[in-house]
Amino acid sequence: NVHEGRVLVETARRTQRIVQHGTQSRSMSNWAKVAEVVRSGHYGPLKVARGLCYKRRGSIGFKPTGKPPAGLDFNMWLGPAPEQDYHANLVHYNWHWFWDFGNGDLGNQGVHQMDIARWGISNATLPKSVVSAGGRLGYKDQGQTANTQVCVFDFGETQLVFEVRGLVPRNEITDLFHFE
């Protein structure tokens, strides 16, 4: 959330505090080395950087509407989201699967692998275009966000392809680089 990020920076300046924000992989020296080697051209021109988030996610089912638990200010929880009835799937951990609060595994776990894949692309700023297709497949529940999704980011000479698969026999969270 860009607005919340700006508020965080303003608060840090006002209170003279140090704030660190980012994806966890940026603090891991092994990924920094991988990105550096990929960008160096040692293996040739990078054509495709792929990020994979194959992480089994079961159905969240259906939770009945009711009163929020004591201690939860549900109005504050909603923030700028539309007013709606409380049910237990809207809060931890399942909030990721509702468009008003999250964007599925793309922004939950996937953002970490997407960041690494993008890190390997020299001079990547904003993509020229993005195409994405997916859906919530395999079960009926209250969730809204895609559990299966493919995104293609066009950075010109290099494409970033990112996949989310929530219906897999085993977890696989990784990145792949394809060279000319």
Predicted regions located by residue number:
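Alpha/beta-hydrolase
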Residues: 19-22, 38, 49-51, 61
